[in-house]
Amino acid sequence: MGTQKVTPALIFAITVATIGSFQFGYNTGVINAPEKIIKEFINKTLTDKGNAPPSEVLLTSLWSLSVAIFSVGGMIGSFSVGLFVNRFGRRNSMLIVNLLAVTGGCFMGLCKVAKSVEMLILGRLIIGLFCGLCTGFVPMYIGEISPTALRGAFGTLNQLGIVVGILVAQIFGLEFILGSEELWPLLLGFTILPTILQSAALPFCPESPRFLLINRKEEENAKQILQRLWGTQDVSQDIQEMKDESARMSQEKQVTVLELFRVSSYRQPIIISIVLQLSQQLSGINAVFYYSTGIFKDAGVQEPIYATIGAGVVNTIFTVVSLFLVERAGRRTLHMIGLGGMAFCSTLMTVSLLLKDNYNGMSFVCIGAILVFVAFFEIGPGPIPWFIVAELFSQGPRPAAMAVAGCSNWTSNFLVGLLFPSAAHYLGAYVFIIFTGFLITFLAFTFFKVPETRGRTFEDITRAFEGQAHGADRSGKDGVMEVNSIEPAKETTTNV
């Protein structure tokens, strides 16, 4: 195999794709800062329409719906990934669904002018649909165009796009920027601008060569794209690997979601994929970010919004750190380090919140624990679950697997946002002990069940699961995953 380079064409394609990740992060974080102002908008709009102010229960319910409907849209969108990518391809799917982003952005941006709470909620639902689809499209596209030796590092860029989006939303949401009573619709409608930018750039990005060769049998086109993306003429080994996978696919019917659980060779990787997605959301990270302002306020911080932005900066910095570590330390190792560190910090958060009234220094301990908690999250549980799903499956079952994994992520995200306030109300500082328990459980699962995929081709990983499944079938019981014992594919030389 020839020497692979990180070419401008590859960087351009991945950067354009991660605009979708940015959109996910931005629309996740954008609703938090203007909470009070949007509640006032809902109150005034309903009062003007009904000649009487709404009840506190109705006001709170409509606000909660405005927040939660985003995750509902995400669940539906993530489960629909396969409908798009198998028919239109990876790149074209990203281009088509940008219509949803424009529509959702317009509804949110114009809701105040139209004096319509319904437009706000509908806009959040539509933008959720869009972001749910992006959580499947982006890591799949990046994984399929990246060289094997750099697949993990480039896969981390998906998470970097998300955290940069969250950080930008936090900064733009400051009252003196766009988080004011007059400008908050622009804050929500801003999502249209990156949509236009991505739509203009996507036609200059190539389609996934794996999709072209395996799904559409366009070998010559796929070969030319690989040569341009990887900066080498010798891509024969990669083309042969795709052709072998294509031959295997031609002997199988299209893989459905139900077959992921019925077929023994798919069952273990889909369970691993779901549990890794749960490890991201049930780690407590979104509870920290959703309610970080309140947590910092409880810890005694005078300007909690700036502390929240500080956590967002830490989030971004350590995602970049993970980018350089993932191909050296491996996915499995980093995921375990991240989970273990978060479990320790979660316990420390509980202790510091319990003691902050008795000891002045405990407020700073709590803030430090939150920042380190966020850092450990971005070392492993943040980026790894998104791209490792694409690595565990071959071309046939990959879209269905991405849909199931993405839906698991969005569903658990929704449940945390829904249940955390009640849990925090009844448990107080002890609420983070729940997340500590989850983190320890996920750490044990990762140690015993999750394979290392660093340096292995998609075909190599798939064969390992098939071998394990056949062994389990012969013995009549579930086999223990032995992928970690297989030698990685011979690493290619990659010039940066």
Curated annotation (Swiss-Prot):
Catalytic activity: D-glucose(out) = D-glucose(in); D-galactose(in) = D-galactose(out)
InterPro entries found in the cross-reference section: Glc_transpt_3, GLUT, MFS_dom, MFS_sugar_transport-like, MFS_trans_sf, Sugar/inositol_transpt, Sugar_transporter_CS
GO CC terms: cell projection; membrane; perikaryon; plasma membrane
Cytoplasmic side: 1-10, 86-90, 143-153, 205-269, 326-331, 390-399, 451-496
Gene3D superfamilies: MFS general substrate transporter like domains
Topological domain spans for side Extracellular: 33-64, 112-118, 175-183, 291-304, 353-363, 421-429
Residues carrying sugar: N43
Alphabetized UniProt keyword annotations: Cell membrane, Cell projection, Glycoprotein, Membrane, Phosphoprotein, Sugar transport, Transmembrane, Transmembrane helix, Transport
Record PTM Phosphoserine, positions in chain: S475, S485
Membrane topology: Multi-pass membrane protein
Positions annotated to bind D-glucose: Q159, Q280, Q281, N286, N315, E378, W386
Subunit record text: Interacts with SMIM43; the interaction may promote SLC2A3-mediated glucose transport to meet the energy needs of mesendoderm differentiation.
Function statement: Facilitative glucose transporter. Can also mediate the uptake of various other monosaccharides across the cell membrane. Mediates the uptake of glucose, 2-deoxyglucose, galactose, mannose, xylose and fucose, and probably also dehydroascorbate. Does not mediate fructose transport. Required for mesendoderm differentiation.
Name this protein carries in UniProt: Solute carrier family 2, facilitated glucose transporter member 3
